[in-house]
Amino acid sequence: MAITQNLINQVKEKILQKISHTYLFQHIQKPVIDDERLLLILSILQEAKLSDKDIEKYTITTMLIQIALDTHELITNESCDKDLEKNRQLTVLAGDFYSGHYFQLLAEAEDIHMIKILAEAIKEINEQKIFLYQKTAANLKELVESIVIVEHALLDKLIAAFHMEKWKDLSSSILLIKRL
């Protein structure tokens, strides 16, 4: 399977089908699918010589997790009126809705190993987000390292799982630059 714009569009369409919910989209902003991250995941998995079915499955599940994490980042803690409070609650539910699809896809495929791999990435991301929110970085290097983990942990786990270490530096650099 060559990575073409057509393939990228097909995968994006399948992701949108998974996350599409009329009521949610009426009240919260529609999630953004990160094209660069999508292309990196597709490239890594394709080079790992996985089947087309597995490439699609792992790309979609990884992107669903990223969308869920990104959606949760939109939640604010500031006080607000009832309409904004409803929006905040729906944003939390949307993030949970998107991540639920990740579990469902891998569970249906009985891919417990990948559930564990991606769950470990989610754990690392959330630990680093807590670290960043606490503002306990001792220096700039620590701060950047935490940001890299937040941005790259999902890909890092895929890279390790499929022994594609040559992608690690490039993909982490691309995602860090995008974040900064």
Residue ranges of model-derived segments:
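N-terminal amphipathic/basic leader segments beginning at the initiator methionine
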Residues: 1-12
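Mg2+-dependent prenyl diphosphate-binding active-site environment of isoprenoid biosynthetic enzymes
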Residues: 13-180
